Structures are given as C-alpha cells and as structure tokens.
Amino acid sequence: MNMKPATAKISSVALKHNIQTIKQKAPQSKIIAVVKANAYGHGVVFVSAAVEELVDCFGVARLEEALSLRSNGITKPILLLEGFFCDKDLPVIAINNIQTVVHNVEQLEALKAAKVPNPIKVWLKIDTGMHRLGVALEDVEYFYQALRDSENVDPQIGFVSHFSRADELECDYTKLQLTRFLNATQNKAGEKSIAASGGILFWESSHLDWIRPGIIMYGISPINVPAQEYDLTPVMTLTSSLIAIKQHKKGEPVGYGGIWVSDKDTKIGVVAIGYGDGYPRDIPTGTPVYLNGRRVPIVGRVSMDMLTVDLGAEAQDKVGDEVILWGKELPIEEIADISGVISYELITKLTPRVLTEYID
C-alpha cells in the first residue's frame, strides 16, 4: 500500500515557461515578479530562486516577506507594494536594498524625518480609479516634489498605479485609468508601472517601463478561461490519493446530510482531501476530479479530511491511485467557475497540512 496525502506539486519548468511567455507579450518592459502571500501559495523561496535570473525585481506585500527573501539568498531588488507600515522599518529597508511604495502623507512625512544609512528607492503610488491605495491625482505634484527634495529618497523616483477592471476585456474605465496615469506623470522623470496580470494579457498599451505579473506567472488566468489559451502552464498540480473504494447500492446516500443519493449501483471512491486542507466545503456535487485519465464527479458533501467521488460501477481504480484536484489536466479556472471561489483564493487558502513537492 502506498498512499500520499494532499500534495501541491510545484514545477519550476512551468514557472520559467510562463516568464518567457510574459516576456514575449511585453518585450520592452522590465518585470516585477509578484511573490506576495508565499508566492500565491506556491512557496516564495522556491519560486523566487527559480525565476531570479529571468526577472528584474520582486514584489511583496510585507517587509517580513522581503526579509525572508534576503535571508534565503535573493539579491535582486524587492518592492514593498503596500509601502512600509512603521517608521522603524525604514533603516531596515535601506540596509537591505528594499524599495518601497509611498501612497499617503503619513509615509511621506516618516520618510522625510527618518535617519537612514542610504537613500531609499521610492515608487509614488497614484490613485487613478481603484480608490484603494494611492495619492489623489491633484496631489501628485506635491508628493513628487517632496520626494525629490528629500535626501532620504533615491532621485530615481518611480510611478505606479493599479487597474480595477483590467480583466474586463472591453472596459472604458481601464482606458480612463491609463489616461489619468499618463497625464499625471507626463513631464516627470521616472519609470512607470500600471499593468499587472490583466493589463499584461489584455491591454498592450499599458505595459510601459515595468509590468507586474502575479497570477499569470503561476499559469493561472485572471479570468475564468484556462490559462493554456494564453500559452501559460499551471505551476501547481494539487493531488491526493484514493484511500478507500466502496461498493455502493442504488438509493443509498453518501456523506454528511445525505445530500446525494445514488440512482444506480456504483463504486464510491474516498479521496484524502477536504476543507481542512483548503479545498472548498461548498463545492457542488458534480465538480470533477481527474483520475486515471478521466474525469469523475464529486458526490456528497466535502468533509474536513475527505471527499467522495462516483467512480462508476465498472471502475478499475485501486486504493492508492493519484487523484488530481486541479492542474494541467483539470484547469483551476474551471474549479473556480464551478465553486464560485476565485482561483486566487483557491491557491492561497491551502493549509499547511498540504504537503509541497518541488519538481524539475
């Protein structure tokens, strides 16, 4: 008997392929590889080491993420996409060659007043319509001049913004955001970045000096269309094993609440993964998994540690056989569409109980 529990298999070959695809889509742009949230659940150290030679910078959300990269040998620049949270972080940022976004007056004043050993590279974040982080359009000039006047700031100031609807392929609001960004930064020295994954795929005019691939770097589409259509390869394959096969009678229910009742004699397979591993509890009956070259449907309610599938009466599957929950054989975008849980959330909500296997 040889059964493996829930395992996320992470492919460096797929990662590198996706970076090359991204470069082909935006050949004139430099790349900030977004590896926040443990590289979208893929393992930040493995991912960053795998692509460091292919990218120009890394993007993270927290200083702790940046310092983890530094302590694990990553030497490329790192950008704090939300900026710094505490005044005391600034000397650490300077010493470790970490760049920071500035998006509010509190950060600006802290930066001006800080005692740092060397100037810090700053990206001024502009709110062009996301209305989350960023300085107002009418305040860009003030912030820009204040940053230029500070000895604590590297004179090469960058400009950054973020689309709110780049995944809508025909959206005038995205065009408006780009126009606002270009107008706000015209006649100002400094490199510009507004395109994340949606912008890279669907809005070529937004590529500018830097692009910030996130979800597409991991071979997942920002819309519920399989990423393979954009020449992207899934980096993660989520697998588990059949741990039991049960003969099941017509008219008998399966699982908690008896919400599914078989209309025929069949075989039920029990798979060692559940919501305790991060697989969605509310996923509906009929959602496919991939087993021995075919799709079979989940039946009954997903429980904490297991789910059940209808193998069919004539199934030849065996205990220990590998089951794929998503990956190249079964696009995560399809699971996202069925479950109502976006792919970003599916991959980042996997729990520590899921083993990670780095391959290639």
Curated annotation (Swiss-Prot):
NCBIfam families (UniProt xref)? alr
Q: Which UniProt keywords apply?
A: Isomerase, Pyridoxal phosphate
Name one matching Pfam family.
Answer: Ala_racemase_N
Q: Which family does it belong to?
A: Belongs to the alanine racemase family.
Q: What is this protein called?
A: Alanine racemase
The record lists the membrane-crossing segments as none
Q: Which reaction does it catalyse?
A: L-alanine = D-alanine
Pathway the protein takes part in: Amino-acid biosynthesis; D-alanine biosynthesis; D-alanine from L-alanine: step 1/1
User: What EC number is given for this enzyme?
Assistant: 5.1.1.1
| Cofactors that this protein relies on | pyridoxal 5'-phosphate
The entry's substrate-binding residues are 132, 304
- What does this protein do, in the record's words? Catalyzes the interconversion of L-alanine and D-alanine. May also act on other amino acids.
Residues bearing PTM N6-(pyridoxal phosphate)lysine: 36
Molecular function per GO:
alanine racemase activity; pyridoxal phosphate binding
Kindly give the SMART domains that the UniProt entry links to this protein.
Answer: Ala_racemase_C
One GO term describing the cellular component: cytosol
The gene name reads: alr
Matching entries from CDD domains are given as: PLPDE_III_AR_proteobact
Q: For this chain's UniProt record, which GO biological process terms are given?
A: D-alanine biosynthetic process
Catalytic residues per the record? 36, 256
